[in-house]
Amino acid sequence: MVIDKQILDELTAQAKASPRLRMNMDLRNSQADLSQRILNAIEPGTVLPIHRHLNSSVTIVCIRGHFEELIYDEIGTLVEAIDMIPGGNVINLPIGTWHSIRSLESGTVLLECQDGPYEPHKEGDVLKI
């Protein structure tokens, strides 16, 4: 599969039409894959809760647009905001890092990769502040 402008535009259109202002495309071969590879289209105004992954590090690359990767401490204090643009930073978040994302430009799409099959966030993995 070539991830071209048409695919990115279609994913962005779905994100814009979604009440959550985001949409993802699963790039795995099957649910049995032992890794996750997901394209995420995120629009300004989408709310991603501060969360962590206790079983995997997470690698994040900006494919198109502009966003900030937000890193927090365990009580919800913002520790770092990392500017993400295509050809810029690539992030590898260690296991257990509290983080979120803020979209700064319409049409933003990122690639997120992590170990293991998809698991919804558990109660203790979403920071309540």
Model regions and ranges:
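Double-stranded beta-helix
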Residues: 3, 7-11, 19, 75-77, ...
